[in-house]
């Protein structure tokens, strides 16, 4: 019973306590409501005291500025501010204010906060900074409830909040961090993030103009402000209308800078924002212009799943542009994506969302979030599936370019992607099926390239392969692949096992298929009329080669063994000649020929790329065509190769077809397959019938003698096929085909696509009469204007590469010179350190003994005592003498240099020897005497001066020569013996090094006489006195201008001049730079040097900029004002950079406040200039 009574009493006490708390809270809320309902004009601000330890709801709490002052550890604030503080503490964890028992009071408090505080200009202008911050904190807490977000909009609070955020942001970005500025911005960005989280409310934010301020805050230096801005913009970018408005602003370059330089969390949020914005075409274009591809690809090495997922989806969107797709391949993006798909990396992730991160940021907890410690393996796996699906989507877009598709195949991409289609029952069904769909789509796009189709015929069973084919070429709709996935997942275990074995069979990294001679067969590249081509590697080497296998039983080589042997000998002989003679950039290199098992093997250069014939098929399936520029680029290279063969080597190819012309990177042409080529004597004809009939000339079909013009006919056929994507002569009936070729009957090229020059060149090349048909030189003369343009481009490219090479050479030379100079300096410093060690040893030996000497040297020179004992022995006297003699020589040289500089600067006169007064002599000599003498009590400080402090290099206190110049010789002579005595008795405790002491002792009278003779007649004419221009000040002024510009508030729209200056400043303070380089660069800038600035930091948009010499833009739409003819490769000169800097300074009003230029303003001062 007593226990039960005790429990009842405890329950009653807790109930009473709860009621007491509720009553107190109700009372506090009513008091706060009453305080807030007081109009600002009638508001009283009584001061009460409360403990400063409770005054922190934000991440940092600086000293209060205008609301009071600090005294004896307490803040003096208004009653309202204290009540707001208590409210924020009591309800910091509340989320549903509209369902709270005191919901009516909360709504009234919120309404009063908005009407009487937030939108009251009078109150805002007179309220202390901490007071307004607490209003914002209370608004932020209440706006967690969606009901209060609508109330804020209905009261007009969003527009006022946006205006206030703009004012605070401009002060923060323009003049640095003031009191509570960061906390205000963090709370306001949170409020706008909450508003933007609801789809229908995003328009409220953009209408108020808050998105512009949020974009400006991407340049914030405080992490919490930056994160708040990113979170709010990411929520806004979920809607298309908001994305369009955001993408109109200057945002992409800032985002790329954050991705390149900031911390992981900032990168992750920035990547997500950029992923959303890349739905807009102008954003994708800016990513390309601002060289964003290398930045994005560098992040593929990260191990954070959500960051990688966002980056890959950005690549999916930007690689829709053909140029960007090529750039991704050049930067190694295809290899990185395939590496992610291989699944041999350990990834991390987290549970956080935009909303949770925003709340953590506002509460100051965002840095406490941890990564994937709490994520289960299943969650990691699901996120990995999403990332792999994104990589498949990126590869799908990339393989639309035939060269990219070829690289995917070469990098074992078909095998890597095909492994992802296999079902796994342990996987999440929905995620797994989606990944299978993306993988099938990537494989189907690769299958659309004709040369890859044999690979896929080995992968799937017949029924599955039919569904795979029926989907069609280049179908992006992911739902079209769901039937294929369902069919695959319903297969029995044995069929799935067979598909898995088929996938393993196409793995290029498996052991070689077989060996032929010393060559390992790695892959089958293709087949031709006379055999197959393989990718091989020499048994003891690493280089990849191509090897053609020719079947000698082909009827073309003869009907019996004797004819075949004769043909083989001729072919080997011709190939040997070709191997030894042909050196041309557009002709394949041959390395070796050999016979084995009735087969001829030809080892040649491996050409990375695809045959021209495959490009024809691919373009036809995509319903695209060659541009005329690309058509001429390929045709000109063919003409150059044939001219070399025909005119210099007298070789006829005889089998020039699209499959024997390889297109590499940037459409570089390589003519291959010289197995049928024939070297002929001058003016002779060939008679054997060889080659592919579709491209054979009429004289070959009529068995007439032919020459090099047979290749001209073939190149005409190829030009026709580039224009129409179909051969000029085609028929399933061989007789009909031969008739068309002999009569040169073909369909005309469609009009309106290409110029008349294309059709004229085709008709001349396809002249049936060999005598009337032009040779390759005459063909080239027909397109001389096109070739001149081609040559112009080549010359420009060559000049650009030469300049780039010269810049690299100079940079490398400068690097090695600096490295050598540093090495010499290091050796010199070590030598000086060693010399001073011996000097110190000689100074200390007579008083401190060997033990103290060993200790001092160990401390000052950082040498172990044992090492010193080993080096300091019987040769010490000789070493010291050498050191002293060297130092004497250096001192004499220094004196000579000093006097020569004095003679250069001053006029020497013999009539002013009596200009010194007696007091001057006396004071000067006293100073001189004090410099030479030292008491025992001064020894410690002098020793510290000598050693330079702990860890610093010893630096002797040298005698000031300007004092010696003013001392008359008779005064020196009068006291020289006194000085000598002091030198003899007190030199051990003096701070001067031994070299000066010995020099003064041995040559004191002569030195004094010499100094007096050099200085007795010095006089300076008043007319020749001029103000000295301080070079350091000029450098600092120029540096001040640059930093002033880079600290201006960010512009909402693109300002390319400021971008140029910003990049220049970054290059000045980069890790590769140093103080000497900084001084040199600023000096060149001040002098307006015509040299180009290195390194070239221009992005792809600068070549669009032009400016007339008078400063007016050539185009009314070009507001940049950058110097004329800025080319991407050339860069910009220091002179042009100086002009750009001055123009930006004029625009920003830098020179309008000359009177204030050298006045400093304390942070937080309100009366500083506002025009920037």
Swiss-Prot record:
ARM repeat copies, ranges: 209-251
Presence of the UniProt keyword Nucleotide-binding in the record: yes
Coiled-coil ranges per UniProt: 481-514
Spans annotated as Disordered: 855-875, 898-954
Top-rank taxon: Eukaryota
Feature: compositional bias, Polar residues: 919-945
Result of altering residue 66 to V: In an ovarian mucinous carcinoma sample; somatic mutation
Tissue specificity annotation: Expressed in the lung.
Family per similarity comment: Belongs to the protein kinase superfamily. NEK Ser/Thr protein kinase family. NIMA subfamily.
The name this protein goes by in its record: Serine/threonine-protein kinase Nek10
